[in-house]
Amino acid sequence: NNPVNYIDPDGMDWYEANNKEIIWTNYTSQKDLDDNKIEGKYLGQAHVVFSGSRDERLGKKNGKNGYIDGEGAITANVTLYGPRGADDITTMTGFTMTSNVNKYGAITEGLFNANYDVNGKSGILKSNWVLNHRKEIPTMDNKPNQSPYAGENYGKPIKTGIFIHSTNSSGYAGGTVSTGCLLLAPQDFQTFNKIMSGVRNFTVRLTKEQTIIVPFPLAVFIGHEPFIRLTTIRR
C-alpha cells in the first residue's frame, strides 16, 4: 500500500447521524459538524463497521475446525465505507472474537480511531491497519488480559497492537491467527487493502450481539419457560 496514492481530494468524509445512519458529507471535522448545527459523530475519510456477536465461532472444513468459511461458522458482517464517495460501500466477512476467546479474550465493543501504520504488523499475516496507533484498547467486559501473549498487559483489562488483518489464505483462523486482532476473510482483506489505499486515518465501530438469559418468575403460572432470552446489541 502507498499511503499517498489517494488523499481525499474532494474534502468529503463520513459521519454518523443520531439515528446511527452513516452519511457522506462535505464536512471534514467534528468542529465543522458542530459549527453547522449538524448533529452526529464525525467518522473520518473512511469508516469500518464490524457487526459481530459474542456467540461467534469458527467452522469446520475438510474435517478440521477453525475456519472462517467452515461449516457451522458464525461470523461478523463487516461494512467498509470507503474514501471515494457515498457509493463506496463494500460488505465483507469478518471475525471479532479471536482464535480462542477463552484463552486469549477479545476487545470491547465501541468506536475506535484507527490509522495506517507505516511499519506494519510483524509475522506472516501482514497488515498496516491498526486501532489507536497500537495503543491500549479495553478488553471485553474489562476482563483481565490472561493471554499467554499479553506481555506487560498481563492481568490488565487492556490489549495493545490491535490490527485488522486476514485469516490464513485457506480461511483458517484458529491457533494463534488472532490473539486480539480483528479478522477479515482472505479475499476480503485484499479488497480492503485496495479500497483503503491512500487512507491514513479512519474509524472502526465494533458491535456485538449478546443474548442474556434472565429468570422469569411468573413462568410457572402461565406455562412459560422459567427464563427469558433477551438480545441486545452492544456498541
Question: What spans do the regions from the language model cover?
Answer:
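Serine/threonine-rich low-complexity intrinsically disordered regions
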Residues: Y15, T231-T232
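Surface-exposed coil/loop segments, especially low-complexity Tyr/Gly/Ser/Thr-rich stretches
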Residues: N1-W14
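Well-ordered beta-strand positions
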Residues: Y15-E16, L183
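Composition- and surface-driven signal marking solvent-exposed, interaction-prone regions
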Residues: P9-M12, N193-G198
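Short, solvent-exposed mixed-charge patches
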Residues: I213-F216, I233-R235
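Glycine-centered flexibility sites
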Residues: D8-G11, G105, G110, G180
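Active-site scaffold segments
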Residues: G161-I195
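Cell wall/extracellular polymer interaction/catalysis modules
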Residues: E16-G175, R200-F202, L206-Q210, F216-P217, ...
